[in-house]
């Protein structure tokens, strides 16, 4: 059994609260099936176009595969997560929606101290109408570096994060950054390809892993602007 509680606030425009629980069954030590139920409530103190208070009930069926082995500082990782869901959004009317979320990670060891690391994240929401405050948020360390955390929203999004990693010591690696993303927002009728590049480093401490990534995000028809460079900082620890 699992449970979740998530609160997301977009300035003073809206606030979304999501509660849920799920059950899972291990088919093998590396694979499992999941069944999740979530309830989402959105409030909008500031009325705006395409922003409306709603509640949403959603049922998801998920499949996960995960294989991980540790070789020095590198995790040789293969992960696939697929979740499909049906939801009902209630405002003045009731709308039935379909969604799919995919996350895939692949690490390829070239030698004892070099590795290529790839990560894909895909989201698709199909609906007869959309609200800005129900769209998924993207951008940042886990989806598209070089852009602010959760600064992008869309009903269709797919990103590929790529790194070439070099390990000069057992507790440190240096990595390049090249991220590419396709984004489509049916509310604004915008469809763009975004990308970013940069470099980073990760090192082990006594408490966990500290990651620093410096990346510059580029939009269509825009040249390089150093002011668009963002430093992403994360600290991972296991309790």
Residue positions per predicted region:
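Gram-negative/organellar outer-membrane beta-barrel architecture
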Residues: 1-80, 137-140, 151-154, 166, ...
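A generic structural signal for short coil/turn motifs at secondary-structure boundaries
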Residues: 11, 90-93, 184-187, 220-223
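Short, glycine/acidic-rich beta->alpha junctions
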Residues: 15, 96, 193
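A broadly conserved detector of short glycine/acidic/proline-rich loop/turn motifs that flank catalytic sites
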Residues: 27, 67, 120, 142, ...
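C-terminal outer-membrane beta-barrel translocator/porin domains of Gram-negative envelope proteins
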Residues: 56-168, 176-180, 184-185
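C-terminal beta-signal and terminal closure region of outer-membrane beta-barrel proteins
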Residues: 188-239
